[in-house]
């Protein structure tokens, strides 16, 4: 038990979500963490990028000097190789079907890009309360033939059956599915938003990052992401796949 330890215990805080938004406002769920920051012995983030931002946030709060450690929340035991040719124009996304994941944007992106790439297909894996809304959006856009909700599945052997992974989440503290998709050699596409996307997506190497800001209209974000998706599939994908494995 904690109280029976011979040596004094250390108090740490693990940041599981964004702590400071683009507009400079702090995430309210961490209000008391920052109010009593000096009582903590150290903090833990999932990425080096969030560690850097947290250092800046603490400095603005007058709390410099508190150690911060970056510890990834997951890792890959091994890479997952494709057992054959990946189906052309195949895209996957996977997450909890929750409004914060913005799967609706992924649907709009693919629906727009499919007008220029008629063979494009998107499979959406995951379960959640947003499923009915997403199903209705797919019907509204008349995209039932090329966008499908696939439900929950063990994705390890599913990732290699696709050429590209699309994420439209507007912030991820890590991004486990991005890590898994990269480990299966997929080309990656998403917003240049903190923190997981720029950790795993290397611009022009294994995919594309689309500039993101909270002030940019969603219609523009969708168009720019659709343009990049088309550009990706008009490219030789082999170097992108190898860069993800690397």
Enumerate the predicted regions with their spans.
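Short beta-strand->alpha-helix junction loop in the catalytic core
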Residues: 18-20, 49-50, 68-80, 129
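A short, active-site helix/loop in glycosyltransferases that binds the activated sugar's phosphate group
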Residues: 31, 38-66
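A conserved mid-protein helix/loop that constitutes part of the nucleotide-sugar donor-binding site
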Residues: 89, 93-115, 129-135
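Nucleotide-activated donor-binding/catalytic signature segment of Leloir-type glycosyltransferases, i.e.
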Residues: 135-152
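Aromatic "clamp/platform" in nucleotide-sugar-dependent glycosyltransferases that forms part
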Residues: 170
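Short hydrophobic beta-strand element within catalytic cores of glycosyltransferases
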Residues: 187-191, 201
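A short, well-ordered alpha-helix in the C-terminal region of glycosyltransferases
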Residues: 238-246
């Amino acid at each position: 038990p904690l109280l029976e330890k011979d040596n004094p215990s250390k108090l740490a805080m693990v940041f599981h979500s964004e702590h400071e938004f683009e507009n400079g406002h702090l995430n309210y769920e961490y209000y008391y963490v920052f109010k009593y920051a000096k009582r903590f012995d150290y903090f833990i983030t999932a990425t080096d990028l969030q560690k850097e931002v947290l250092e800046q946030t603490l400095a603005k709060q007058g709390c410099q000097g508190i150690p911060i450690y970056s510890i990834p929340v997951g890792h890959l035991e091994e890479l997952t190789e494709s057992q054959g040719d990946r189906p052309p124009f195949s895209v996957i996304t996977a997450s909890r079907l929750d409004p914060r994941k913005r799967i609706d944007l992924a649907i709009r992106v693919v629906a727009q890009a499919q007008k220029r790439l008629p063979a494009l297909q998107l499979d959406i894996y995951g379960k959640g309360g947003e499923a009915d809304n997403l199903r209705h959006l797919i019907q509204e856009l008349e995209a039932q033939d090329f966008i499908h909700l696939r439900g929950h599945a063990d994705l390890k052997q599913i990732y290699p059956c696709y050429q590209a992974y699309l994420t439209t989440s507007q912030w991820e503290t890590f991004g486990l599915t991005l890590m898994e998709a990269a480990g299966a050699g997929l080309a990656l596409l998403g917003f240049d938003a903190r923190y997981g996307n720029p950790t795993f997506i290397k611009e022009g190497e294994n995919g594309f990052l689309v500039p993101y800001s909270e002030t940019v209209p969603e219609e523009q974000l969708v168009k720019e992401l659709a343009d990049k998706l088309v550009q990706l599939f008009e490219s030789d994908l082999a170097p992108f796949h190898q860069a993800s494995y690397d």
